[in-house]
């Protein structure tokens, strides 16, 4: 079963096959010229051997990186084994063990400051698995990471709030100055973004919001803001995020999120809910409660909050649609809304909300989850029949709470039942208010400081790139 979202799996209908069958990345093999030719044979262990007049030579194994796959118009899931190996629990444990050894031997030049950022959805997935409250779960997970050698464990709320504020501002700007680029499409789901770049290219990309996802905003905060507070540099920090889907591994590997100045990626490693479960299982722990809890770190310039697991309005995928809808209603039409009702259309994964005044439709927003609804939305946009001003798009059915790397339901239980439980847990969380002292202080002291008018744009926004289709004989299906 594939680990990536359906938006990536279904780029081509026959995509779920092994790398040796399908990967079309051109590879240069250094061989000596031979007038007599050479024969390549496959050995029993799967290795390749070249036989020529000069002798027998074992060919080197092709190495394909995440960056290669993001720049390729071919498959995604066919190279899945290669991708996961570079963003995996094994790689994380290798780095942590090496760092702990460097600390033990006082090898200061080799020691890195390790930061774990944990998003809400994995916390809820683990809380449900181990029958704990979300706050207790987070503290036990923090204790586990500290035991591995983490120096700091933080939540994502500040990045979630920054993403919401930047998205709302971007929407207002578009609505007032460039309505041709409406509907504005959400940008926080990497599965959707990757699919858009590879399949619809320059037609769809201008509609996608440029605001970075919370994961990548956290990357900026950790590698730049936190590095400055610690009086170090970004390449001296190893940043790990815990996310609900495998597509976040692809997002962290985008070249857009590599800093030439810091010589490091904003996020070095992404692990998922399932991988955390596997790591805990490897310790033969019957319950997460057996792990000593640890307080969550708070490195931001305001008073420490009373809670660290927060929810957002309307959806478990960040609450973009409802937050922007309410803000735009107030800002554009002077309409104050306490709640927004998103009504299901053909299915629960396609919902819409409409702002009306005197029988006239002022705004129309939608939430589109899952590949089927994404396809329908894009086709309507291409035919010029889209009536929406904003669409919150997530590749996974039911959104991020049902991310592809969330812990699976027990045997005999439907995934839909588990998702409903997680949604209930999410709605019980304290509601985040993006306009808070912490966010305002970060804007004043970091993003808008020093008179640099481009700093906020460069650190909180990104760009997208059409992936050209490769016309190669290797693409031909027989």
UniProtKB/Swiss-Prot annotation:
Record-annotated disulphide pairs: none
Entry annotated with the keyword Zinc: no
Pfam families in alphabetical order: Fe_hyd_lg_C (PF02906)
KW ATP-binding (keyword) present: no
GO cellular component terms attached to this protein's record: cytosolic [4Fe-4S] assembly targeting complex
Binding locations of [4Fe-4S] cluster 1: 23, 69, 72, 75
SMART domains: Fe_hyd_SSU
Listed GO MF terms: 4 iron, 4 sulfur cluster binding; metal ion binding
Biological process, per Gene Ontology: iron-sulfur cluster assembly
Assigned keywords, A-Z: 4Fe-4S, Iron, Iron-sulfur, Metal-binding
Coiled-coil annotated spans: none
Chain positions recorded as [4Fe-4S] cluster 2 binding sites: 189, 245, 396, 400
Main function: Component of the cytosolic iron-sulfur (Fe/S) protein assembly machinery. Required for maturation of extramitochondrial Fe/S proteins.
Family that this chain belongs to: Belongs to the NARF family.
PANTHER family per the UniProt record, alphabetical: NITRATE, FORMATE, IRON DEHYDROGENASE (PTHR11615)
Name of protein: Probable cytosolic Fe-S cluster assembly factor AGAP009023
Protein's organism: Anopheles gambiae
